[in-house]
A protein has these predicted regions:
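Repeated scaffold domains used in trafficking and secretory/extracellular systems
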Residues: 1, 51-66, 112-122, 158-171
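Short, solvent-exposed coil/turn segments at beta-strand boundaries
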Residues: 2-6, 31-34, 65-70, 118-130, ...
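Acidic, serine/threonine- and glycine-rich low-complexity intrinsically disordered segments
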Residues: 1-71, 75-77
Length: 171
């Protein structure tokens, strides 16, 4: 939910019942008269974004809200259905739901240098960042991605493995 609008991020993929139907990752919106008594009743007919068109045909794995209408997208590493077949999701980008602009994230290690990305993450909408733990070929490192699409390496963790990062805030 961004303001009075609800955005739906759909992973898309392949219809596994058939070999022919391919559904793109997409963003849909619910707003205005399509929200009645605080409940969504319909999807806006004037808002549809084919994320595969924006991301070089990469499918969506997960998304994280960064504030200021921007989401960090975690995408399958390889484009097209090869991404599903191969299965890793080591590509990131920033998507602005208002402008519908997509910006690839810079500053991340090459996909071949990333062994794993932890599922747990730390999101800070006040600062517009999301932090992930990456197990790279040189060890565990926390990477922070900002809403401008820049990833910055942070703390290197001296451990065999780390399963994620969290953010605690005092209210």
């Amino acid at each position: 939910v961004v303001g009075d609008k609800i955005y739906l991020f759909c992973q898309g993929g392949k219809n596994f019942q058939t070999n022919s139907l391919r559904v793109p990752s997409a963003v849909l919106r619910i707003s205005g008269s399509n929200i009645q008594s605080g409940k969504p009743v319909d999807i806006d007919s004037d808002y549809y974004v084919d994320l595969n068109d924006k991301t070089g045909d990469r499918y969506l794995w997960r998304c994280y809200y960064l504030g200021d209408n921007k989401f960090c997208l975690q995408l399958f590493t390889n484009p097209g259905m090869d991404g599903y077949t191969e299965g890793t999701h080591k590509t990131f980008g920033i998507f602005d739901v208002e402008t519908q602009n997509y910006t690839p994230v810079t500053g991340m290690p090459e996909a071949g240098d990333i062994n794993d990305i932890a599922l747990a993450y730390a999101s800070d909408t006040d600062k517009g960042t999301v932090t992930f733990e990456l197990m790279t070929t040189s060890g565990a490192v926390l990477y922070t991605i900002n809403r401008n699409g820049v990833a910055t390496p942070g703390t290197k963790v001296e451990a065999e493995v780390i399963k994620g990062a969290s953010l605690l805030k005092q209210k």
